[in-house]
Amino acid sequence: MLYNRLFLVCAISFWIACFTVPASAQNPGYQTEFTVAQDGSGDFTRIQEAIDATKAFPDEPITIRLKKGVYKEKVRVYSWNTKLSLIGEDRENTVITYDDYFDKINLGRNSTFHTYTLQVEANDFRLENVTVENTAGPVGQAVALHVEGDRCVFVNCAFKGNQDTVYLAGERSRDYFRNCYIDGTTDFIFGEATAWFEACEIRAKSDSYITAASTVEGRPYGFVFHECDITAAPDVKQVYLGRPWRQFARTVFLECNLQAPIAPEGWKAWSNKDDKQTTFYAEYASQGPGAQPKQRIAWSHQLSKADAAAYTPEKILEGWMPEAAKP
């Protein structure tokens, strides 16, 4: 009888240890949900105030919910704001806006990198249902979104600007975009990070270049666009898919609908003659009036079905598979 009781006690203890959530996980001891509302109904009226109130390097994810409104502020997610999500009520009416640009900042040759409306330095960041815009206009470099963190996710967002709208920094950083809208003029998606764009609309507002990847030597992938719509404003006459900001740039368009008037050659070199030998530009199964594979420049590539099949989010993002990318 005593043996049976001891066995029962041990079994119950084992079950409790395995299946009971520790109190620290149920209540981490810090606030994990915040609301920002301009009418005062939330915890804060400004986004930056909410970010500054969060715990540094939290064990549990933190969510800041943004009520509808136009938030005119420069927002910075610091490196210690890891596992942070900013979730808007809806994309069209939840807007973060600012109007800095190169000459206004006036901090020397690198002023571009200070012009952001939203800058993300932290890892494991998520933005959803939000518009981020730089309203400086056609006055030179003016960044809307600047990302330096790793494993950053953007779902159902809009990024609006002119030159240099989206800057994806970090030589080993990985970013994932799904169902997003991005517009701009010159080089409006640029940087050295690895990024996957799924089912996004990419809209050129002038005759210019869509991408300017600066992939570093030795990195296997740069920007990959999958099943995206490439569109243009009505008065646009010619758009290039990209040009290499650095000589090892890598950009691929997979099964994209090229509705914009893409230049027949598709891609263009920068000033460096070595670009043609070291850059990797490719397409697979492009559709629409801008798809002219036989007229593309000789140093670009048309992928085979087998080659294209090797391009998956998990492979491109080196084993990181964000929830938004899962079927």
What spans do the regions from the language model cover?
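Positively charged n-region of N-terminal signal peptides that target proteins for export
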Residues: 1-6
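Bacterial N-terminal signal peptides
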Residues: 7-19
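Sec/Tat signal peptide C-region and signal peptidase I cleavage site
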Residues: 21-25
